[in-house]
Amino acid sequence: MKRPAIIVPEDLGGKVLLHACCAPCSSAIVEWLVQHDIRPTIFYYNPNIFPFEEYEIRKNESKRHAESLGLSWIDGDYNHEQWRQDVCGLEGEPERGRRCEQCFTLRLTVAARKAKELGIKYFTTTLASSRWKSLEQIERAGHIAEQMVNGQCSMGNGVVFWAQNWRKGGLYERRNQLLKEFDFYNQQYCGCEFSKR
């Protein structure tokens, strides 16, 4: 029997905190979640994006998308200088290198904290929809974030990272259709100044 492309955790409970990197990457995931009676709270936390004007464009597109669907959208704030300190020494790493994994871990840890604060058990990320990103790095980062927020002894009561390949099930193709339908701004680089090389 063929395994379904999207595996929904049995105890999801109809809600998830979705860390969103941008509107284009979020669009098909959000559509799929809503169609399957899962209400995402969209959490926009991307201090890696540079310059600030680029960050504002992407943030506003993400917010516009969520508002058009009547979904909760949370601004995770922007502190690029702190992000630079957190990836210090990794500036020369290639895309999909150690800098990216550190960046994912930082962002997903903040997302996990937000999920815990809101009482949402599961969190996931749109980063896993990009063909330019390593799914293995994203999954590791999500599980590290889960452990950092829960501590060693969560006894099953903590937040859980929903590791999902959001490229599957036709979602990547649907993303490209929704990009045109919503007339989203579509960036040409991941976000940080080092990814522009």
Predicted regions and their residues:
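Nucleotide-activated chemistry modules centered on ATP-dependent adenylation/adenylyltransferase
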Residues: M1-R197
